[in-house]
């Protein structure tokens, strides 16, 4: 793979079987794979630029070809895995004492999980719709922690959330109520949220023709209102915001490659033409040849890069990298930080100025973190993978969020708000108010869009790379695996830009591909339903309906599917999703319905048509044979 005339990495394949033998990076480093006689990955080695070889991990497999034991030689932790009869992972035991167990329901959804370390653990249960209670069986209705329900959902006839009840304790509950934007025609509606109300506090939203957030009005408990208006260019890049909340107007200028070249801050105004000089300006200067998306100077501060496009000198800090894209060591400005990653590239440890924090993961979700200073924090997630609560020093705390997923506050079990956060549109922390007695505001790591914030570094860790809210860009380029997977969609992309310069209505929790904060979760749920039972045409109808809702925010099913490929939430749904993407009927249906804005009467018939086309293919037949063998049921045609 080459960018700007420079080859970033080269993969050498083994003869006969085509397995990846070695990946060599532009820095001279390489990763070498070792396979067992069954052609399963048995070990991996890191080869440094000077030729030294370090073994990273070892795998052993069970008789079904599943990894039974994984030994991480960097962290010294060995994990053993247990599976059920159809190959789903149901248990993990780690040599450091961490144990995880999972339970699935008849639709292949995670029904709940328990984990424990040092004899302290928690049980989380997801509540799905019960037909006998006149609930929709495909939707989540709540979450329990240690047997106590903490979240409950109510839906309208279209399956949209209209109320979320947060149970802080038996005696303290708050309720969020949602309304939705009407469609262009009578009787048509959308999945775009028009308002969110919680007690005497509310937010309302309007959108432009492309589905971008145009205005947000925040109504406080005292009845006062503060408005933010957003402006976008033809590429949906944020070019201006009139921010009454921050009492300023900000204008953004980009070059043709999607690089921000100037950011100007003015006194708050709603005038279309600004004649006064900016109160503050930030300037960005880029590489003039080769890889032109590389930021070389920010407000005069220099940035230098290695051959992979990773910064070596970054705004007063020195950075060291390994395995192509992994940030290993950062020094400067009183900071000395080391990071360690697992075989999937997820961070499992950081050591900052002598204090080590270990992360205990389920996929990319941090179930718990412990630090060498003796602290432990447990985190809890909803059925869509969004963090909603934490436990610290034996006390439960709950996050208050806005529609964008920004964590605005932390509440205790009495519903009292102890911490308040305020960010700019790009996630830079502007204000932190902490009324707690234990420094909760700084201790809590989840902030803007629900991302993990490294307080010491001033950046967000997005599961594969770091995002700097000061510059509004990723620190290093995206992994070129993204280009290999979706070359037609991403080869023209700026691999350093954050959410293609639309930070308001988009998020990128993986550091790979952005998604909209409003509707892609809904589409993802529908795809998961198809994966759980690909023989139910109503599940396919849901995919089509959600895809229609995304137009023109996301063009067709395929683009949304590409976004979901890089998340850990969808499990093994890639094959199903690709069937949607490449089914001719699906493309034709989506194209014919692009003029709509919301649900239509033809949605269900469209879903049935896609289902009919899919079930005639070889993928369906093979899958159904296995499904019938395991489940012993007939498909619903």
Each language-model region and where it sits:
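Beta-turn initiation residues at beta-strand->coil junctions
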Residues: 1-6, 12-14, 22-33, 43-50, ...
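A residue-level detector for well-ordered beta-strand positions
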Residues: 11-12, 33, 59, 81, ...
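Short, acidic, Ser/Thr-enriched surface-loop or helix-capping motifs
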Residues: 15, 25, 36, 62, ...
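Intrinsically disordered, low-complexity Ser/Thr- and acidic-rich flexible linkers and loops
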Residues: 49-52, 125, 131-136, 183-189, ...
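A motif-centric feature for acidic-aromatic and gly/ser/thr-rich catalytic loops and repeats
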Residues: 130, 178-184, 284-288, 391-463, ...
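Short, low-complexity export/processing leader segments characterized by acidic and small residues
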Residues: 347, 409-410, 428-432, 468-475, ...
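Compositionally biased, low-complexity segments of secreted and virulence-associated proteins
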Residues: 511-535, 540-636
């Amino acid at each position: 793979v080459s960018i700007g005339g420079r080859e970033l990495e080269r993969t050498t394949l083994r003869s006969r079987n085509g397995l990846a033998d070695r990946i060599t990076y532009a820095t001279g480093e390489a990763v070498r794979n070792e396979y067992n006689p069954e052609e399963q990955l048995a070990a991996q080695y890191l080869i440094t630029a000077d030729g030294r070889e370090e073994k990273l991990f070892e795998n052993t497999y069970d008789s079904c070809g599943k990894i039974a034991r994984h030994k991480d030689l960097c962290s010294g932790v060995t994990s053993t895995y247990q599976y059920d009869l159809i190959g789903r992972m149901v248990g993990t035991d780690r040599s450091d004492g961490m144990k995880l167990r999972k339970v699935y329901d008849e639709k292949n959804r995670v029904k709940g999980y328990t984990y424990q370390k040092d004899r302290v653990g928690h049980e989380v249960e997801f509540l799905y719709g019960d037909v006998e209670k006149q609930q929709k069986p495909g939707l989540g209705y709540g979450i329990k922690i240690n047997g106590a329900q903490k979240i409950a959902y109510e839906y309208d006839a279209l399956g949209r959330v209209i109320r979320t009840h947060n149970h802080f304790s038996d005696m303290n509950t708050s309720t969020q109520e949602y309304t939705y934007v009407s469609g262009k025609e009578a009787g048509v509606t959308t999945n775009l949220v028009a308002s969110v109300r919680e007690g005497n506090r509310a937010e309302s939203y309007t959108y432009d023709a492309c589905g971008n957030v145009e205005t947000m009005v925040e109504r406080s408990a005292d009845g006062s209102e503060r408005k933010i208006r957003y402006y976008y260019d033809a590429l949906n890049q944020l070019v201006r915001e009139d921010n009454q909340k921050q009492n300023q107007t900000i204008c953004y200028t980009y070059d043709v490659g999607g690089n921000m070249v100037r950011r100007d801050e003015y006194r708050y105004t709603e005038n279309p033409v600004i004649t006064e000089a900016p109160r503050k300006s930030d300037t960005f200067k880029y590489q003039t040849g080769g890889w032109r998306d590389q930021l070389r100077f920010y407000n005069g501060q220099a940035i230098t890069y290695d051959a992979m496009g990773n910064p070596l000198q970054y705004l007063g800090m020195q950075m060291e990298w390994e395995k192509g894209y992994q940030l290993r060591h950062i020094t400067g400005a009183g900071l000395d930080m080391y990071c360690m990653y697992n075989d999937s590239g997820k961070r499992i440890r950081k050591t900052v100025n002598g204090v080590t924090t270990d992360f205990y993961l389920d996929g990319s979700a941090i179930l718990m973190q412990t630090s060498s200073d003796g602290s432990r924090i447990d985190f809890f997630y909803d059925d869509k993978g969004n963090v909603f609560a934490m436990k610290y020093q034996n006390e439960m705390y709950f996050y208050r969020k806005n529609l964008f997923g920004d964590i605005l506050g932390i509440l205790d079990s009495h519903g009292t708000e102890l911490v308040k956060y305020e960010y700019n549109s790009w996630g830079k922390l502007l204000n932190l108010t902490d009324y707690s007695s234990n420094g909760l505001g700084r201790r809590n790591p989840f902030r803007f869009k629900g991302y993990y914030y490294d307080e010491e570094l001033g950046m967000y860790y997005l599961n594969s790379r770091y995002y700097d809210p000061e510059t509004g860009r990723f620190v290093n380029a995206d992994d070129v695996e993204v280009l290999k997977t979706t070359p037609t969609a991403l080869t023209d992309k700026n691999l350093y830009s954050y959410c293609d310069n639309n930070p308001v209505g988009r998020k990128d929790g993986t550091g790979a591909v952005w998604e909209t904060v409003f509707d892609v979760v809904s589409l993802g749920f529908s795809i998961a339903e198809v994966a759980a039972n690909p023989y139910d045409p109503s599940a396919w109808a849901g995919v089509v309906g959600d895809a229609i809702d995304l137009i023109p925010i996301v063009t067709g099913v395929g683009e949304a599917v590409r976004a979901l490929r890089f998340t850990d939430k969808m499990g093994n749904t890639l094959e199903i999703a690709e069937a949607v993407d490449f089914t001719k009927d699906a493309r034709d249906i989506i194209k014919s319905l692009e003029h709509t804005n919301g649900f239509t009467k033809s949605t269900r018939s469209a879903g049935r048509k896609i289902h009919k086309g899919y079930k005639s293919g070889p993928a369906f037949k093979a899958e159904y044979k296995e499904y019938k063998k395991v489940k012993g049921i007939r498909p619903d045609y």
